[in-house]
Each structure stands twice: as C-alpha cells, then as structure tokens.
Amino acid sequence: MFLYVAVGSLVVARLLLYPLRPADLTPPYWVAMGATAITVLAGAHIVEMADAPMAIVTSGLVAGASVVFWAFGPWLIPPLVAASIWKHVVHRVPLRYEATLWSVVFPLGMYGVGAYRLGLAAHLPIVESIGEFEGWVALAVWTITFVAMLHHLAATIGRSGRSSHAIGAADDTHAIICRPPRSFDHQVRAFRRNQPM
C-alpha cells in the first residue's frame, strides 16, 4: 500500500508539474488500475480462507480494504479513457499498435477477475455481476489488441520482404555490405582495452 501511494504521488506530481504532451500519455498509465485490481483479488482470496486462524481474525478488515480498493479502480477508468480520447481524438495522434497496449488489457482483465472473486467472497451479487461484465470487456480489448498485433506483424513482415527484394534487385555497384555482429568475447576484449589502468 505504501509503495502504491508513493508511486502514485510521483505520477501525479509529474502530471501536475510538467507540461503534458499527447505523446506522454502512454498505455502503461493503466497499470495503476491493475495494481488496485490485484489487491482486490488478493483480499478476496484471504477472505475465502475459512480454515486459517489469521484469516478469520482479519477477514473483516481485509474485506473492507478490498472493497475500498475495488471502488478506487473504477474511479480511475474515466480519467484514463478521457486521456485516451484527448490524445487520439482531440490531438489526432493516430492509434497504432504498440507492445505497450497490452498494459491496458491486463488491468481490465484483473479488475474483472478481482471484482468477480470479491463478489463471491463478500456475498455481493452486484460486484460479482460487474466483474462478469468487466471480464467480457477485457476479452473484447484483448481480441482487438491481438488482431492489431497480427496486423502489425503482417505489415512488418511484408515491408521487410519488399525491402529485401529491392536490395536483391539492385545492381552490384550499390550493393549493401552487411557485417556480422561482433561476438560477445570480442566486445569484452574491446571494452577492457579501453579501460584506464
């Protein structure tokens, strides 16, 4: 909890103290919601541990803390969605596939699982239903991200295939000479030679 508050404070300070450009809003900001969701899931598992004496003593406190973290997670969704709209709609930054988009998928899925488990553990049917719905949202986002990744992969392979064909068709006077990468041992020896004695 302390680490979460410390990192959250640093992120908020960065957002408030420095000018924010659209390119600065990257998908990893969604990880903040994922951290709350993991906390909710862990709390739900502790509440469900009926046989452990320590779990029996702390189950009320853990259940209450889990509900607080669960309530904080959805509070983060509107600002994150608004930031994405500000970046891609208002400032017209194209939405292209990048590997960091997967950091949106995980928090949504974890939030769905955490809410579902908390609903079961604390006997809160509304929270359980929200978890089920969020699971479907996470599956949809996963599918969109996966299809975008496949499209990006196909486009990248297509580009590299066209460029290698163009290189093969070039005449010999303009041939590109490729040198194999240096071995690790060679790099270590070069590093040691450049070190002062």
Swiss-Prot record:
Q: Does the keyword Transmembrane helix apply?
A: yes
The stated induction of this gene product is: A member of the dormancy regulon. Induced in response to reduced oxygen tension (hypoxia), low levels of nitric oxide (NO) and carbon monoxide (CO). It is hoped that this regulon will give insight into the latent, or dormant phase of infection.
| Keywords carried by this UniProt record | Cell membrane, Membrane, Transmembrane, Transmembrane helix
Q: Which residues cross the membrane?
A: 30-50, 61-81, 101-121, 130-150
Please state the biotechnological applications recorded for this protein.
This protein serves as an immunogenic antigen, inducing gamma-interferon responses in whole-blood cultures from M.tuberculosis-exposed adults in Uganda, The Gambia and South Africa, indicating this might be a good vaccine candidate.
Q: InterPro entries, alphabetically?
A: SLAC1/Mae1/Ssu1/TehA, Voltage-dep_anion_channel_sf
Q: Which Pfam families match?
A: SLAC1
Write down any Gene Ontology CC term.
plasma membrane
What GO terms in the biological process aspect are recorded for it?
transmembrane transport
* Keyword hit for Acyltransferase: no
- Which CDD domains does the protein's record reference? TDT_like_1
**How is this protein positioned relative to the membrane?**
Multi-pass membrane protein
State its location(s): Cell membrane
Q: What is this protein called?
A: Uncharacterized membrane protein Rv1735c
UniProt source species = Mycobacterium tuberculosis (strain ATCC 25618 / H37Rv)
